[in-house]
Amino acid sequence: MQNLVFVDEAGLNLSMSRLFARAVDGERAVGNIPRSKGGNVSLIGALNLDGLIAAMTVPGSTNTEVFLTYVTQILGPQLWKGAIVVMDNLTAHHAERVRVAIESVGAKVKFLPPYSPDLSPIELCWSKLKQFLRSCEARTLESLDQAMADAVNYLTEDDAFGWFNHCGLFT
């Protein structure tokens, strides 16, 4: 289990806000919700039992070039010989250059079966991370990056262990 590293992408939006609110009985819940839809941002990250080990945000969507940049500049230095990088079946993940970049540091590449996000603990990580980011109400890329830096402390090793356990990786 120590060698498993799950890599995935998540879509974010700069107009994300809390989904639920509470108020004193008889009072109306009040909060700020942007009127216009903000820009889309892709979050690429890697999760192991220590937590979120490598994350990068990019405006717009992810393609092979963006993912290759993530692998070579962000993920690669965090990997070790014997690491097993587990990814879903996004087209960018199957690029030969991506496989070569990961294997050049001594790691192996494995793919999840099609349509099986329930086997990937990073999906649960994204859920908790998005909840945190909604509460931060980041409206610019800079504030989103700062919120991401704060989120690394918000996600604990106990969370990661629980997500791995929930996905059946300890049975």
Where do the PLM segments sit?
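Short, basic/hydrophobic alpha-helical segments
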Residues: V66-I84
